[in-house]
């Protein structure tokens, strides 16, 4: 970038030192951002220039700005609702008890959303910075799945949603019990949220060469192709999720992805042949398992 280099030289000549960030094109037509620093030698009239590749630093800074922007946006809505409804109740403007109850429910709903978001952010931060202590050992996968399904079955009672389990042969996986429970809970809770009434959630396992694949399928509306690429991003919520009254921080699937990766597995989504979506993830087989 000759123009930037000339500018750097003129500034250094005038002030004896100068710094400038600029973009350079490499031989393969890719570009990198660099920090150019130029200083005049104390013993000679020569100028010394040092170039630092700051492409990764700029990327991290952009990610941080995006994160702060997203957090601010996501926090603003529930806080505004809580404040507006609280002010209305405090002012005594509502004489109708039923209407007051509606406002109180809105406050509670958004307070829960805020609480989930803060908890999710803290959990995600701990995972991403390696602060989550994992005790990876051989676990009975079927036992953990059954335990999670039992703890969540109350979610399907009112809407008559059932869970069907289809297991392969005996499967032990290498995982942290708390991480596995969190992954299963998040995915099965999501399946309940977006399943149609009187439908069935299917949980199945497939034995692969070195891993076990776990599939959780629902009979909801499914996820569009356009949204699939963003489904595991922080704060992303599908159009259907935004249209419902379900609480959600948009962090659950981001946590799932990070936890699965921490356990040396993979995670993804695919559409069902009939209706709904299938979330899948893999975990390493326990070494004692037969191939």
Q: Where do the model's predicted regions map?
A:
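PAS-family sensory/regulatory modules and their coupling/dimerization elements
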Residues: 1-56
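Short conserved segment of the HATPase_c
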Residues: 66, 223-235
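Short alpha-helical segment of the dimerization/phosphotransfer core of two-component systems
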Residues: 109-114
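Conserved micro-motifs of the catalytic ATP-binding
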Residues: 129-134, 172-175
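Conserved catalytic submotifs in the C-terminal HATPase_c
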Residues: 135-139, 157, 162-171
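Short beta-strand/loop element within the Bergerat-fold HATPase_c
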Residues: 198-210
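Conserved glycine-rich
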Residues: 264-265
